[in-house]
């Protein structure tokens, strides 16, 4: 999809936009989402980050999925100046100056950090949000020393990108996500995160993410996927947590899985 394709769809008289889920938890599926809810999501993100009219934003994600579409909507709704580049593993290549706001996936961030000029630009982006999958602990450790505001996002297509952010850089770096205003979270019987975000999602959403909610009843952190739980001797073990503990002692790529 081109930028013109999406802006034409956005400006037509239909109240909804067609999006597709990423397929990370199954086969990608089409989904109709309301433009008014996309506008609400855009305003919430811009308000949380303190973005203002005239700030520059970078579109380096495919417009076939919600992450790219929402960058355009944020620019249209909040008056951001949007710069577009072809989606690639090196989104900052060829740019003369850093945007105020950008959204990337972990691989784009990692690749940019390997090139001196791109790494310098990456450190100058005032607000960098990273979504589309979990980054490595090594990447997080490097980002912690960045002078700008780097955030990990939590959300999915059904929540119109993200409903919570957590800081990855600076003294405020944390494992705990902070939900946006109006978003409530809880756990179901299996310990999976339940999201109530009426501004962006009409129905309460039960995820497959095993989570922990802080004592304030608001902040939360993700332990791993429900289908990555191993029951050993009556004790439930989260594969992602085991991998995180072992990673400093293993000098190669590895994974832990259930015994067939």
What residue spans do the PLM features occupy?
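Conserved pre-ATP/AMP-binding loop-to-beta segment of ANL
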Residues: 3-20, 53-56
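Conserved AMP-binding A3 loop
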Residues: 16-43, 50-52
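Conserved S/T- and glycine-rich ATP-binding loop of Class I adenylate-forming
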Residues: 21-24, 57, 72, 102-103, ...
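Active-site glycine-centered loops adjacent to acidic/histidine catalytic or metal-binding residues
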Residues: 24, 132, 155, 209, ...
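AMP-binding/adenylate-forming
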Residues: 33-40, 56-111
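Gly/Ser/Thr-rich phosphate-binding loop
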Residues: 115-170
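Conserved ATP-binding loop and adjacent catalytic segment of the adenylate-forming AMP-binding
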Residues: 148-190, 197-204
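AMP-binding/adenylate-forming catalytic core of the ANL superfamily
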Residues: 208-260
